[in-house]
Amino acid sequence: MQIHSFSLKNIGQFQDLSVSLAPAQDYPSNITVFIGNNGSGKTSLLKSVATALTWFVARLKHDKSNGTPIPESVILNTANAAAVEIIVNDQNLQQQIQAYTWRITKNRTARKAEFSTYLSELNQLTDYYKQWLGDDDQSSLPLIAFYPVERSVIDIPLKIREKHQFLQIDGYDNALNNAVDFR
């Protein structure tokens, strides 16, 4: 799975922003770099992508689970609603590259909905991964991690007293939030 692009509507200081990630048709590089002054919105971009990806992780674990909602505090001051849309490319069951799109939205309290949430392609994508894992429990899952500036370490055990077994899906625990636990 590779993020192709994402768009923000009324998030932070961005009223309407679309970002394509490398590699793009005009730029064959494999790296995307965000450069800007303090307060220019780099973290808003990354947090928005992380918020959208929490829905992938949640739906991969349980069919109807919700990811992290868009916080009302990040909605543009002059707007009543916000949306984050993400497009990822991945193989489908026929081993063909396919684009999957999903959109999450947030309305200010007691305000009319401006955008609609769209999750059907996300559900298709997570269903494919569930089927792959069901067929072969050693199937690869996408690597997803987010390390914000304020990420903190909750607990580091000095001695590991027992041997633990982990499922691949457990790797997503705390991968997109601000804390890490080494237990």
Identify the residue ranges that each predicted region occupies.
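P-loop NTPase switch/coupling surface
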Residues: 1-183
